[in-house]
Amino acid sequence: MRRTTVITIVVALIAGLAGIALMPRVARLGAQTTGDADLAGAARAAVRDPSGHRGLAVALVENGRIRTAGLGDRDRTGQPVEPGTSFEIGSVTKALTGMLLADQAAAGVVRPDDPLGATWPAVTGPARNVTLAELASHRAGLPRLAPDGILGWARILWSNVSGGNPYAGQDTDAIRSAADRVTPDHDERGEVHYSNLGPSVLGHALAARAGVAYADLLRARLLQPLGMDATVIATHADDLPAGRAHGGRASGRPLDTWSGVGYAPAGVGPWSTAEDLGRLAAATLAGTAPGADATTARFREDGNSHIGYGWFTTRHGDHEVVWHNGATGGFRSYIGLERATGRAVVVLGNTDKGVEPIGLRLLGVPEKEAGEAAPVAPVWIGAGLAVAFTFLGGLSLLGTARRRELDRVTVVAAVVWAFAYLGLAHRMGDWSVVPVWLWPLGAGLSAAGATLALTRWSALPVVDARVPWRRLLSVASSLLAAVLAVAAVSD
């Protein structure tokens, strides 16, 4: 066996073994339990597949009694989830914003059929004519997000790749400006089309009418009366609750928190606990929560669901559940109420694996009706990214190493890209559905390709003499792209 071949095999084996230590670690629900032991046991039994979950906080309301429990880990260091651990609650906040509308209507401050412009005179565009009730029920014909041009969509795309906050920098003025610019879709107005912009406009409109910020109005009218002292809105990183859960993908990648002011009424920035949301659920079931009338089903969504002010009502077989869920970068949430049985449930999770089926099972909904957690994206996308990026760099590098005409700058670019691809695979691939041992194989393959290329190093020119400027420009662009790719997926 040639010396070069032996060296290549040895280096590949070493890289593969090192890759085992560095390979992705899929989140898995930990064994730790806090709070009510019986509820914790029931919740764990409701988790059909612990893979993809890291920690859960649960509240169950029965006959006015609230029980809470924590399962698993709140972060990657193994700290336990407790009933008082704070989680991002995402779009569950839309239900709270709907309750604010019902509360302010009951107080005579506004009427649900008031036009937006009468409540928030600063909005002067075509959307000023939509009603508060339409905003609360996703029937205003507004888009899902504020129109923000190419740069806005680029920011969202970058945040999805990098695991960042797609709503950073969006304040109240940005929402008002968006409401001014947007023209409601007349074909969609009156029908339920889910929107983050609509509830955000509603929340800030109610706050403007009251002469306070949205967070202050929510605290004064809903949170304080219910004793929800742990529920806060983080407008920036300094506001994050102490001892909070840390969110991430089911595949193990940590993700940034979402914070901000503009989309806070729709779920960007609010944090709560199973204890606090259990209080909300109990009071709403009892009809004593401010704005509890928001849960009344008023408008038809489809044959199986209706919507009130923020709250959905859906029939699951013999069970009619009033509910809302939430999803931010690395968190999932669910609150469900069943009036017929006087029961309610709250489930909070710190990965992007859905928790709705867990909540429905705890309410007694049959397995078939409870279903399974829907993936964030089609499974084939995450699996394809994992496999393709894992092996693409190594295979490309092997091809480069075998080229007859080669130069050093090309080798450098190929090596950098090979390991950039490994980083992309590690961070962007869905390793909850792809065997994680493939990643060390990819690392070994890339190391083998790099070794073969570097064995020719001394005999290679710095740059191909035929078109040096074109080669240098191409390699420089390639290296820049590789560096950006690595930056995007770094913690």
Residue ranges of predicted features:
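Short, well-structured active-site flanking segments
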Residues: 84, 96, 103-121, 209-237, ...
